[in-house]
Amino acid sequence: MASVTSTYARAFADVVFDQRLDPAKTLQEAQSVAQLAAGSRELWEVWEAPSIPAEQKRALLDAIVGRAGFSKPLRNFVAVLIDHRRIKFLEPIVKEFEHELNRRLGFVEAQIISARELGAPE
């Protein structure tokens, strides 16, 4: 699974940088789609059902994207996951996508420990 998630995450990060999209906005949209899907059993059942044609799955995706106002590159990315039957990996792909964006932007996660409680200005 790790190679699947990293492959798709890197590919989508390539799109973000090649098309000069706003990484933060694109990540937020991707997280929103993942949260929406995670919160809807019915949506998952449709997207994962092999008996439902991909065209119908993409039509449902288009309705969601249109209603939420998500970008076309995000729509296309999710459509690729649907078409390649990788939609079940959406959540870990989005998490890996976040790590990939952070890596490319030079961000690193840090844990800060203080001997005393810090105030808001600090």
Task: List where the protein language model places each region.
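Elongated, mostly alpha-helical coiled-coil "stalk/stator" tethers of large membrane protein machines
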Residues: 1-122
